[in-house]
Amino acid sequence: MNIDGKRVLITGGSSGIGLATAHALALRGARLLVTGRRSGLVDAAVDALRATGADVYGVAADVATEDGRAMTMAAATRYLGGLDILMNNAGAVRAGRLEEIQEDEIRTMIEVDLVAPIMLARAALPMLKAEGGGMIVNVSSSIALVALPFYATYAAVKAGLASFGESLRRELNGDGVHVLTVYPSGTDTPMMATNTAGADVGFSLESAAAVAAAILDGIEREAIAVVRGGPDRQAMIDLNRDDPRAVDARFLSIKAAFEQGVRPHKAL
């Protein structure tokens, strides 16, 4: 896909991977609408993007709500006149033992990470189909490929998003709309700020800019998937497929330290 002139909606576009991708797309000539729940962050993101010459608008909206999604889609029509690319990037996470996580926290992850992308894709499809060359980019997680302990709900919703994208891609094959699924590994973003797990338990972080560059490449190639994490992550994915008990044993050996590191992880 040639990105120049494309109209792109990025949810969760005021920070992290979303903002980094907005910068990368702007350099390719895309027109942008970025969303986020916090108006101050959205305004700051828009100012930073416009300072580089980007054609960008922002809207403060909670895509986990019906009203927030309606506001977002109305803004896409008002500011961009339609859509060529929908990037479902907004995310929420709460780590810890399942019985210690509150029901409202579980529901928030389900609503933000799974329900919102499905509903936004549904709402955007008429616009994407009208252009005859649209794309949906769903930001899942490498945890959808190898489910980590103490992330049961987050792993479930991210795996659900990946399966949603796979099914929808096949449904839309031949209809002019492509679906790309992105699987970031650990990324240095505000969402990861409360995760204290380190390299001793296998956590390492790459920059949001590196992930954004990979997403940009995936969009241009109309790739099916972008998987981050390098050879070590791919080896873990392969092992999890071929010998899941070996992965069970590996996590058991670091379970106490792993739990201590990820237990504070919360971004809702």
Regions picked out by a protein language model, each given a short descriptive name:
Residues 121, 157:
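Active-site helix of classical SDR
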Residues 28-45:
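Conserved glycine-rich Rossmann-like NAD(P)H-binding loop of the short-chain dehydrogenase/reductase
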Residues 141:
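Residue(s) in the substrate-gating loop at a strand-loop-helix junction
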Residues 14-16, 38:
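Conserved glycine-rich cofactor-binding loop
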Residues 181, 197-235:
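C-terminal helical subdomain
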Residues 39, 60-73, 103:
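The beta1-alpha1 cofactor-binding region of Rossmann-like NAD(H)/NADP(H)-dependent oxidoreductases
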Residues 97-98, 102-110:
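Substrate-binding pocket helix/loop in short-chain dehydrogenase/reductase
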